[in-house]
Amino acid sequence: MVMEKPSPLLVGREFVRQYYTLLNQAPDMLHRFYGKNSSYVHGGLDSNGKPADAVYGQKEIHRKVMSQNFTNCHTKIRHVDAHATLNDGVVVQVMGLLSNNNQALRRFMQTFVLAPEGSVANKFYVHNDIFRYQDEVFGGFITEPQEESEEEVEEPEERQQTPEVVPDDSGTFYDQTVSNDLEEHLEEPVAEPEPEPEPEPEQEPVSEVQEEKSEPVLEETAPEDVQKSSSPAPADIAQTVQEDLRTFSWASVTSKNLPPSGAVPVTGIPPHVVKVPASQPRPESKPESQIPLQRPQRDQRVREQRINVPPQRGPRPVREAGEQGDVEPRRIVRHPDSHQLFIGNLPHEVDKSELKDFFQNYGNVVELRINSGGKLPNFGFVVFDDSEPVQKVLSNRPIMFRGEVRLNVEEKKTRAAREGDRRDNRLRGPGGPRGGLGGGMRGPPRGGMVQKPGFGVGRSIAPRQ
């Protein structure tokens, strides 16, 4: 019976489950996923403050892994992408959160290139591995969202002339929770407000998580079992992905000295490469881009006629709103910007009293606002009675809330700084952030690609449900 070839996504998800399970249970065995010519990058900076270089080969990778002091690592996988690449390889991108040695969770991105091991079908090893913590790349910077209360009252005309589009970060996510003893939480995606005022929304296709009963997946292996296998054998379809790891063998992963026949060439594309069509921008965005050009003219006419004719469109003047008694209370107290802090990445279930008690440790809190506009995470503002607590909070960053949530704390910008940012954004126009990725792409790894199976499957290739 000829078994069907597993899809790249199925291969990627099974690899992710095995890799992060071993990272939690036996990090000293992690180097067995790699081969003699594998490359490995795991974030961090060297002694000169520059991004650390890659290391090559099992010995160097093992030394690098041990230097990370992985202890009781818990991983929350938020998303896994996998695509077919050259010579039946699979490229896998993982996004999630990682906690090492019971420290706070940190967002990370990791990319693997899985190459065929060569001697056994559907057996892979890690040829390239790139890992980065997001806070090492982006830092704790976050752009302050537009205030909605005071500036709507005091500057209604400016708000008309500079409409700002709030980007929709509510992408589709699914929890890819690793099936070891890791914590399983159905959390909302940790998204932050984008700094660009006029983003062009793009929608990426998201792979549906479907169980494929007829496709084989890679057999699970464990370091405790030392039984050596000689040839692959089919297993029953009833075998499931959640079987105990200790029932499989890791000996075949390290005992084989493979010939270079399984090397990955740099030419040729396998016939099963998954081509995902990129979504095209909608043509209806064109008339929307013309609206800001027409609004200033209409606003100018409204201002010229304001003395005799009340405006028919747009926000009502402050004079009329004040008569209704819904605006004047907001203007009673005006706190200096130096007494205020912007707080981002707030948990969606946090309440004002809990957050106020937390910041009371730094000084007297006179006012606290939490803005929850339907998008997560929430953000807010804390007002102290003096500027000293503000500087105290800023000097103690990073600020950990509940011991596990890292708050994005920034000093509130002055009005002139906010207006300057808006002018810069309008001059720059729509598009992505300025600049590009730091550094350049590294060339191909040195030498031939003689593999040591890391993502080995042991004795057999078993179909999974």
Curated annotation (Swiss-Prot):
One of its GO terms (molecular function) is DNA binding. SMART domains: RRM. The keyword Transmembrane helix does not apply. It is found in: Cytoplasm, Cytosol; Perikaryon; Cytoplasm, Stress granule; Nucleus. It is an enzyme of class 3 (hydrolase). Residues 145-242, 254-326, 412-465 are annotated as: Disordered. Residues 409-465 are annotated as: RG-rich region. Residues 296-306, 317-326, 412-427 have a biased composition (Basic and acidic residues). Residues 142-224 are annotated as: Acidic disordered region. Residues 11-133 form the NTF2 domain. One of its GO terms (biological process) is stress granule assembly. This is Ras GTPase-activating protein-binding protein 1. It comes from Bos taurus (Bovine). The gene is G3BP1.
